[in-house]
């Protein structure tokens, strides 16, 4: 039996949209077992505003797209990569987490940067909602 390729990706997963789904499907297509880290609220707040959806809802929304869903309690996936030791770390071209990338290279593993889906983002959706709310209060 051949060794299975283990992949690791991570998302905030707030307002799961087409870009998230495509990213997760692409990650899954390139490995046999996909671990997906869902960032805890604490992790998100290291670099972004507080998510609209609570952690448990974001966790559940990601479940259909990964074999194993785990909590990522830091913005960097480094701790989870050290614990899981995936063969592949999936990143987005919109950002690359240097510490985790350096670690993966140091243990002879791969980093694959998948294209950012620029047509839609959680931030764009939130801005649209805010705009509509502002219009309705005028």
Residue ranges with predicted function:
Residues 1-138:
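Nucleotidyltransferase catalytic core that binds NTPs
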């Amino acid at each position: 039996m051949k060794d299975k390729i283990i992949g690791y990706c991570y998302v905030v997963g707030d307002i799961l949209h087409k870009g998230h789904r495509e990213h997760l499907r692409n990650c899954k297509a390139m490995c046999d077992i996909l671990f997906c880290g869902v960032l805890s609220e604490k992790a998100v707040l290291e670099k972004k505003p507080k998510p609209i959806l609570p952690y448990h809802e974001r966790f559940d929304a990601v479940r259909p797209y990964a074999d194993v869903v785990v909590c990522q309690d830091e913005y960097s996936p480094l701790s989870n990569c050290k614990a899981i030791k995936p063969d592949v770390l999936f990143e987005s071209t919109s950002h690359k987490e240097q510490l985790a990338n350096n670690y993966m290279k140091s243990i002879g593993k791969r980093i694959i940067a998948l294209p950012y889906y620029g047509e839609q983002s959680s931030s764009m959706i939130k801005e649209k909602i805010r705009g509509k709310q502002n219009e309705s209060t005028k």
